[in-house]
Amino acid sequence: MEKDVEFSTYNDVKNFLDSARWNRTHTIMALTMISGFFVWGLLLVTAPLVTQWPFISPSNDIYVLVSSPAGLLAGNLILGYLSDKIGRKKLFITTITSGIAGIIGIILSTNFIEILASIFLAEFGFGGEETVSLAFLAEQFPIRYRGKVLVLVSNSANAGVAAISAVFIVAGYSIFTEKMIFLAMSLSGVIIAIVTRLKLPESLRWSFVSSHYAELTDQRFGSPVPIMVLMLFAITIVLTFALVADILGPYEYPKYTSLIPFIYGLGEAVFGYAILVFVDRIGRRMLSVMAYAGGTVSMAVFLLYIYFRLPFDVFVILLVVNAFFGELGWAVREILQPELFVTRYRGLGIATVRGVAYSLYIISIFALSGISVYNYMIFATAAWSVGLIGSIVWYSKGYETLNRSIS
């Protein structure tokens, strides 16, 4: 859509992109990212789900669980840095190649080492490309669509979580059946991603900045306040979603290993679509306070559930309530990550924020191994409180990005 247009200044580029009408190129960009995030959602809970496979001994569960965030962490840091250097579009073929190799490895795996390496490789590709995808979407979409598109695309990961968890619930009697359905679902997303990615344009913002950055004095990494706030948000969402929905199953409720991520993923997917109605009607700062305050309170109620030994049904209700605030917190974070960094450092900035969170997540898997459910929930509540602090800081010290052009 921009090949026939020439730009003399960066403001011309921004005005052109920010005021554009939705067209076929926007549809292709949204579709390829939705398919990629859906496949990532399938992979996001693959590690805890495959701990049920007989060739994974309980003593190796923790290493399987770590393989997923380890691959995602490596992918985020490497791909985020490279995307600022060589462009967004070029990396999308690399990421999908790595992801496909990992998926094939998961299907063919017959032992612990193979599944470990395959999950790492798949997450490196599809999980690692989230950084590049968020930067690309924020840079290419008009202001009036930017927030909704970022939420819509990232929410497809929740749909993937719910879908693959449902497969493991229904087909839990057969590893072969699980693998075949997983392969079919992955291939459907991968095929759409490949076809659409071949038609993707390069990020126009990145192209202009990369060739004129010496003239653009505003292309600096940024002040510490936005970076700190984004790190606090990332710590909350990464630790609480992954820990409550993914890790709680294998450690504390082995009978419900598939059911817990299914309920949480389905709840977040449904709420994600509902959030589209009001995400651009409320300022980002207020939305962040709503999300992280609600999440902190709902997580604290889990402590009462454990203290009074309430039925598992009550746990499910609390899980759904927390899923709403979890999705709202996820949405705010997904929107603000690309909005608060400049184009020259957007990939590196998002990768840095996510890198800190996933590093802590990996540490927490080992640190929390064997602790009581009550102490576990105290940790989760404290993690939500971290995000609440970040939201208060951003509300009082930050600036509004709703309906504002990004640099």
Predicted regions, residues:
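Cytosolic juxtamembrane N-terminal segment immediately preceding the first transmembrane helix
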Residues: 1-47
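Extracytoplasmic gate region of multi-pass secondary transporters
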Residues: 47-48, 220-273
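Central cavity-lining transmembrane alpha-helices of secondary-active solute carriers
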Residues: 66-81, 262-274
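Conserved MFS/SLC helix-loop-helix module at the cytosolic interface between two early adjacent transmembrane helices
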Residues: 74-110
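Structural signature of the two symmetry-related core transmembrane helices
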Residues: 90-104, 287-302
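Hydrophobic core of transmembrane alpha-helices in multi-pass small-molecule transporters
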Residues: 114-128, 313-328
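Cytoplasmic helix-loop-helix junction between adjacent transmembrane helices
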Residues: 118-155
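Glycine-rich segments within core transmembrane alpha-helices of 12-TM secondary carriers
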Residues: 145-172, 189, 353-365
